Amino acid sequence: MFTLSDFDFNLPPELIAQTALPDRTASRLLEVDGTVAPARLVDRHFTELPSCISAGDLLVFNDTKVLKARFFGQKASGGKIEVLIERVTGTHTALAQIRASKSPGAGTTLRLADAFDVTVGERVDPFFTLNFPEPCLDLIEQYGRLPLPPYIEHDPDATDETRYQTVYASNPGAVAAPTAGLHFDQPMLDRLDAMGVERATLTLHVGAGTFQPVRVDNIAEHKMHSEWYDLPQSLVDKIAATRARGGNVIAVGTTSMRALEAAARAADEAGRPLAATQAETDIFITPGYRFRVVDRLVTNFHLPKSTLLMLVSAFAGVETIRAAYRHAIEQRYRFFSYGDAMLLTRRDTPEAPLA
């Protein structure tokens, strides 16, 4: 039984990366192999990633695009509000978090960015439905602000608008970036293609719940947020082909991992093979989970006590991740969204009863 304190660590605040490096691939890469004892830790640069993978392997990317989802505005009474779009639900509708001195009721008009009005609809706890006067994706792109994570202390600027998106982002809908993908630039993707490494994409729209803290000591009691994903048939076919030739399936980021494993678990439970899937998932991966698809994972360094730290601990091993994080802190790696990366290899056996 793991508790919340098992996933805590002390991080010097100066190791929280506040800005992106000048070049996407300039970050460092900690290669971690917990299948051997003691775990093998190799300090690399991200430009070395191609040398760590092989022709015939499959890299799976999340092609979601971050919305300019944050708005400041006011109620008709003049009271100030802050709005964070959680999910676009229709051409003119979205779910949002609203911070205000008093929660607005249905029918309330809100002025956003001093540019347009939205009307509050029904409450879908903990969110509010907002009705937009024009297509909401257009208004969000024109008037919204990029929703940088809460631990990044500066206001978003033009650099962030480029660097807090992956170079392959194509499906608008996220309110946080799939940050492992931020390290890839087009020359690296071209280099991987030339090596014979396969690439495929899925979509998982990352919600603000990714920053939601775990507030219970017994992690089994935590209620995971839900996110929408789309795993296409073309990816299913590439996974099958990769398995047939003995290659590794490598998830780029925890969001790609969660979509792949959610679809695979659903297929298992239905007694059928992996298939194209569009669905909601609230999958919560903790030590003891049996991974069905992913062999290796490219990921950033995660927050203490976070669900993502639990996920990587389940994947590579709790003690392996503890050792890797101690090493990263000693070696002054940069942490979180704009920080450095890890390349993890899946542990052979789960550490607790199967989930």
From Swiss-Prot:
Reactions accelerated catalytically: 7-aminomethyl-7-carbaguanosine(34) in tRNA + S-adenosyl-L-methionine = epoxyqueuosine(34) in tRNA + adenine + L-methionine + 2 H(+)
Superkingdom as given in the UniProt entry: Bacteria
Chain's role: Transfers and isomerizes the ribose moiety from AdoMet to the 7-aminomethyl group of 7-deazaguanine (preQ1-tRNA) to give epoxyqueuosine (oQ-tRNA).
Family: Belongs to the QueA family.
EC annotation from Swiss-Prot or TrEMBL: 2.4.99.17
GO cellular component assignments: cytoplasm
Keyword Transferase: yes
Pathway annotation: tRNA modification; tRNA-queuosine biosynthesis
UniProt source species: Burkholderia lata (strain ATCC 17760 / DSM 23089 / LMG 22485 / NCIMB 9086 / R18194 / 383)
Keywords (A to Z) from UniProt: Cytoplasm, Queuosine biosynthesis, S-adenosyl-L-methionine, Transferase
GO BP annotations listed: queuosine biosynthetic process; tRNA wobble guanine modification
Pfam families for the chain: Queuosine_synth (PF02547)
Compartment annotation: Cytoplasm
UniProt protein name: S-adenosylmethionine:tRNA ribosyltransferase-isomerase
Keyword Membrane: no
Any one GO molecular-function label of the UniProt entry: S-adenosylmethionine:tRNA ribosyltransferase-isomerase activity
Family annotation (Gene3D superfamilies): QueA-like
Main location: cytoplasm
Assembly information from the UniProt record: Monomer.
